[in-house]
């Protein structure tokens, strides 16, 4: 299975996977508005691949059923909150 990958012009580290290059017909208009102007990254063969931040099976399933897959960055870990929680548990 081949897919085309685009990065968002508005959201950092946000990528959109679609079945056919430059065919955004399956992507909702509201998502395209939030995503901004898509910037082409590459065409990728998904079989036998491992993706850094996405489960390749979920990507393939979403492409087959919905027509696109949106990859968003993982939530930012607040190290200050973790440190404060660790300190609080040490003093209790």
Curated annotation (Swiss-Prot):
Residues 1-84 form the YcgL domain. It comes from the Bacteria. Transmembrane segments: none annotated. Gene3D superfamilies: YcgL domain (3.10.510.20). InterPro entries: YcgL-like_sf, YcgL_dom. Signal peptide: none annotated. Pfam families: YcgL (PF05166). HAMAP family: UPF0745. This is YcgL domain-containing protein PBPRA1080. It comes from Photobacterium profundum (strain SS9). The lineage of its organism: Bacteria, Pseudomonadati, Pseudomonadota, Gammaproteobacteria, Vibrionales.
